[in-house]
Curated annotation (Swiss-Prot):
Disulfide linkage: 37-100, 47-93, 84-122, 111-149, 115-139, 169-242, 187-292
Name of one Pfam family that matches: NTR
Main location per the UniProt record: secreted
Residue ranges of domain FZ in the record: 32-152
Annotated localization: Secreted
Protein name, as recorded: Secreted frizzled-related protein 2
Length: 292
């Protein structure tokens, strides 16, 4: 365990007092949750191998059960794997699995500088995948470094992050297609849908996209029925290792095309639906007459 963190935890064990101002998402009732320390579960990959073994519940994000923490923490693993900052995991674990000391009522938050450093490096990565830096990670909530908090790692003990130009997902590359190109591409694929995104997840390095069921338009569909579409799932293969600037706003509709591969609908082309754009207007009109 790093010396600074050891000293921090030793100091924390001696600092009993009010929790006012230290729990930004609502002050917990420690009259009955005083010793609610739980072992960090083995399946919690986000915080596996962190410098401490016990976490406090409720955590800094308001999660009250281990199961809830496991479910929510999993969604942040891709950000850690992007290696946007050396302390990303430390910062996230200080929120999802804050260090717990039996004799301490105070919850130990990440320092303001830790949050700011991680945000500066990782917010652009999140934005590239269509996610803004969330309000729940607002750095102004966290204490200055001269208070009791989890600090940024010393620059003497970390290696600089290598920042390579991110690879663009093949399906998201700007090909400057006109309406004829789009129509030709449709004929090469098994499906073409206009969708709005309900949920994005990452599984085994691939991006799983779940569309809104009530906001999709079907232009082409081979091998699937309307019943199948009620639980439709689209896949962007290798999505964890590439960026897709086309999806930097998941609140807008998209035109997605792709092929059925091994029972999965794999996206080969993804474009933001530009309302009023000539190519998309012609596409909507021409699709009814199309004969591939």
């Amino acid at each position: 365990m790093p010396r600074r963190l050891c000293a921090l935890l030793l100091l924390a064990s001696q600092c009993l007092g009010s929790t006012a101002g230290l729990f930004p998402f609502g002050e917990p009732d420690f009259s009955y949750k005083r010793s609610n320390c739980k072992p960090i579960p083995a399946p919690m990959l986000l915080c596996r191998g962190i410098e401490y073994q016990s976490m406090r519940l409720p955590n800094l994000l308001g999660h009250e059960t281990v199961q809830e923490v496991l479910e929510q923490a999993t969604t942040w693993i891709p950000l850690v794997q992007k290696q946007c900052h050396p302390d990303t995991r430390k910062f996230l674990c200080s929120l999802f699995a804050p260090v717990c000391i039996d004799d301490l009522d105070e919850i130990i938050q990440p320092c303001h500088s830790l949050c700011e450093e991680v945000k500066e490096s990782c917010a652009p990565v999140m934005s590239a995948f269509g996610f803004p830096w969330p309000d729940m990670l607002d750095c102004s909530r966290f204490p200055k470094d001269n208070d009791l908090c989890i600090p940024l790692a010393s620059s003497d003990h970390i290696l600089p992050v290598t920042r390579e130009a991110p690879k663009v997902c093949d399906a998201c590359k700007n090909k400057n297609e006109d309406d004829n190109d789009i129509m030709e591409n449709l004929c090469k694929n098994d499906f073409a849908l206009k969708i709005k995104v309900k949920e994005i997840a990452y599984i085994n390095g691939d991006t799983k996209i779940t569309p809104e069921t009530k906001s999709k338009t079907i232009y082409k569909l081979n091998g699937l029925t309307e019943r199948d579409l009620r639980k439709i799932v689209l896949w962007l293969k290798g999505g964890l290792q590439c960026t897709c600037d086309e999806m930097n706003d998941i609140n807008v509709p998209y035109l997605v095309m792709g092929q059925k591969q091994a029972g999965e609908l794999v996206i080969t082309s993804l474009k933001r639906w530009q309302k009023g754009q000539r190519a998309f207007k012609r596409f909507s009109r021409s699709i009814r007459k199309l004969q591939c």
